[in-house]
Structure formats: structure tokens, C-alpha cells
Amino acid sequence: MTDSILKCTTRHIRIFTARCENNDLVQDSEHLTLDLDPDNEFIWEELVIGKVHKRFSELVDSYSGKDLSDYNLRKIGSDLEGTIRQLLQAGELKYNPDCRVLNYSMGLPRTKDLL
């Protein structure tokens, strides 16, 4: 494997080949660390976080035995972005009105008035 940390960075997902120790990332090719919505664009309930983590585990398992590459990490990150979009469109996830920049990066909120 490599001596440097591989990473995938999307708008709402960051994945690292590292583990957290004392709030620092330590390179570890045997672990993947998921940083979910680092900008706090959404309001997260534990059930929804659980769904994203479950999907993350499924995706990681699907790549078992394959090379851990930048491409595969980006593919996992992109698939997780799709999961977040689905949760938002289903109304299970909501935008955070108190986030730093409210830009509706996944589309305008879906309300009964707009449907």
C-alpha cells in the first residue's frame, strides 16, 4: 500500500485511509474514516446518520478484495452523495437554516406547497 493518506472529498463526504487518534488522522490502509457533512449543511437525526453509515459499510464491503485506490474511494464518495440526495428528496434529511452558507447544493427543499 502507500505511505500517504488517500482521500476522497465531495461536497458532503470526506473519506480517508486513516484512523482518528487524539483528533488527528493517522495513516492506516486498513481503515477508512468517514467525515459526514463537514460544513453542517444538513440537520442530521441519528436514524439518518445510521442509514448513511450502513450504506457506507455496504459500499466498502462491495470493494472488498479490490485495490484501494483514489478511483474506488471517489466512487464510494459519489455513491454516498447519491444516498444523501435520496434522503433529502424523501424528506428524511433537511437543510440546516443556520449553516454558514445556505446554497441548496442538492436542490431546493421539497415542501407540500412546491410539489
Swiss-Prot record:
HAMAP family: NDH1_NDH1M. Its main location: membrane. GO terms for molecular function: oxidoreductase activity, acting on NAD(P)H, quinone or similar compound as acceptor; quinone binding. It is a peripheral membrane protein. The keyword NAD applies. It catalyses: a plastoquinone + NADH + (n+1) H(+)(in) = a plastoquinol + NAD(+) + n H(+)(out); a plastoquinone + NADPH + (n+1) H(+)(in) = a plastoquinol + NADP(+) + n H(+)(out). Its EC number is 7.1.1.-. It is found in: Cellular thylakoid membrane. Belongs to the complex I NdhM subunit family. The gene is ndhM. InterPro entries: NdhM. It comes from the Bacteria. NDH-1 can be composed of about 15 different subunits; different subcomplexes with different compositions have been identified which probably have different functions. Pfam families: NdhM. Keywords: Membrane, NAD, NADP, Plastoquinone, Quinone, Thylakoid, Translocase, Transport. This is NAD(P)H-quinone oxidoreductase subunit M. GO terms for cellular component: plasma membrane-derived thylakoid membrane. It is an enzyme of class 7 (translocase).
